[in-house]
Amino acid sequence: MEITWNDFEKVEMRVGTIIGVDDFPEARKPAYKLQIDFGPETGIRKSSAQITHRYKKEDLLQRQVVAVVNFPKKQIASFMSECLVLGAMGSDNDIVLLQPGAEVDNGLRIG
């Protein structure tokens, strides 16, 4: 499916730093609850991520990631997800987080 440049510009992807990671036992598939700091303009957002196979909780803290921050909130079990963390998904659904190649300021927009 082809999209227009105007469609792409509507997707607000920003860099944020993971500042909190908790287990999410209520999720249907193994997942973590993440708190991500997107800087002063966007603030701290929560997200659920099915990345327990590849990442330990302690390895995620202070890691920068890329997320879509302008999707509507989504209820996942008892948790309200406020952004979508992006990653590359392999054939076995193993997700590798998308992150900047060097540390950048939280909140920088991807474009």
Where are the predicted features?
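Phosphate-backbone binding interfaces of nucleic-acid-interacting proteins
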Residues: M1-G111
